[in-house]
């Protein structure tokens, strides 16, 4: 049964929209180190409901996104889950690079559809502090109609995968960096690696000042499309509250299907196979500087929001499972990506810098418990595991 109020539904706001007054709320992207840098603010709204505000240095756009969990975490299922955002951003980025390489080679692609599966693991006991989140290799199927022979097509697709900026998170074995505030005072870290520099100011009271820009699309950017079809996943789960069990040995599978519409919008159906849940349709488009019109969030925005959402969920799980006090919690995350090797014209593989996350906790627990909240949340976060694990995307090609 859902816990807490359904704030996302009560707000009457779209789940995703462009913020037109970023200067008023004070969000600015970090310095642009290697191509694009994004600052992501996230706050908890109600148990597992969260909202993010993401600002990009390259595009100049600021987006608000929202996330929720389904019955497996006693959520309201009002918005797509945190892991879906990385899958959506990743498959959108792959489509960007494939189409850019095809354009460079003057290749006509008559039809294309991408099908992606992301897999994660959760093993151990929360009470024993042995629970660890993991990430497994990604599977990508490209359904395509074009005139390239098999060898040339395979080479193009592998080059596109490597050219994606997310390649830097997958292949870099990046250890994330952190800073921690408890009740408005910075405290020393436990096991986590520290950020060099000062703790950022807490965006505590700045979220409520944003204003939504009217959409240029005659449809929601995010909307539910029904229950995900069931498929057998070894170690998969579907029961209510299953993600809150103390002892776990489970496999998660988030899928995505991406098509490129005639209007230039990438339409992505997110599939929640395990834990089994609701499918959502999400739209993506690159900004004008990257060749699009910026009518929906770009790939880097979805990826950045996804990591921060997933990390925030682990705080919620930890304190709920151990009955700890955590009144409010927020993060400010900085992510740094290169331009795409094809879409950005670098001709190089995509790269990234380690994520830098500032954490703000309001709690009556001790400093040691606050440190443990951060350490366990990082330890159990699937997407921080994704960043520190060297993985390749497994490619399969289907001719249409």
Predicted regions and their residues:
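Extended beta-strand/beta-hairpin segments
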Residues: 1-88, 99-305, 316-400
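Alpha-helical metal-binding/catalytic segments enriched in His/Glu/Asp
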Residues: 90-94, 310-311
């Amino acid at each position: 049964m859902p816990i807490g109020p359904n704030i996302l539904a009560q707000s009457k706001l779209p789940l995703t929209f462009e913020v037109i007054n970023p200067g008023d709320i004070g969000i600015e992207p970090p310095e642009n180190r290697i191509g694009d840098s994004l600052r992501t603010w996230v706050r908890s709204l109600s148990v597992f409901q969260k909202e993010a505000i993401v600002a990009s240095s390259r595009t100049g756009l600021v987006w608000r996104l929202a996330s929720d969990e389904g019955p497996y975490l006693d959520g309201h299922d009002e918005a797509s889950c945190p892991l879906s955002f990385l899958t959506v951003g990743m498959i959108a980025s792959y489509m960007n690079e494939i189409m850019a390489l095809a354009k460079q080679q003057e290749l006509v692609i008559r039809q294309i559809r991408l099908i992606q599966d992301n897999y994660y693991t959760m093993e151990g006991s929360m009470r024993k502090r042995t629970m660890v989140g993991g990430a497994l290799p990604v599977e990508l199927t490209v359904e395509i109609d074009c005139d390239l022979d098999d060898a040339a097509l395979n080479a193009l697709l592998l080059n596109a995968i490597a050219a994606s900026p997310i390649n830097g998170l997958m292949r870099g074995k990046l250890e994330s960096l952190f800073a921690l505030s408890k009740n408005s005072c910075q405290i020393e870290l436990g096991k986590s690696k520290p950020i060099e520099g000062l703790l950022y100011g807490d965006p505590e009271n700045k979220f409520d000042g944003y204003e939504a820009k009217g959409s240029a699309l005659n449809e929601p950017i995010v909307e539910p499309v029904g229950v995900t079809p069931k498929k057998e996943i070894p170690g998969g789960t579907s029961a209510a509250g299953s993600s809150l069990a103390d002892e776990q040995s489970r496999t998660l599978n988030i899928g995505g299907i991406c098509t490129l519409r005639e209007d230039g919008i990438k339409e992505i159906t997110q599939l929640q196979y395990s834990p089994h849940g609701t499918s959502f349709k999400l739209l993506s488009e690159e900004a004008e500087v990257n060749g699009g019109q910026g009518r929906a969030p770009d790939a880097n925005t979805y990826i950045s929001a996804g990591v921060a959402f997933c990390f925030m969920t682990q705080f919620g799980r930890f304190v709920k499972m151990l009955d700890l006090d955590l009144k409010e919690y927020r993060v400010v995350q900085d992510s740094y990506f290169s331009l795409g090797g094809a879409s950005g014209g670098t001709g190089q593989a995509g790269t990234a810098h380690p994520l830098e996350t500032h954490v703000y906790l309001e709690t009556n627990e001790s400093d040691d418990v606050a440190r443990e909240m951060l350490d366990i949340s990082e330890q159990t976060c699937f997407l921080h595991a994704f960043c520190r694990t060297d993985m390749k995307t497994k490619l399969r090609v289907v001719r249409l």
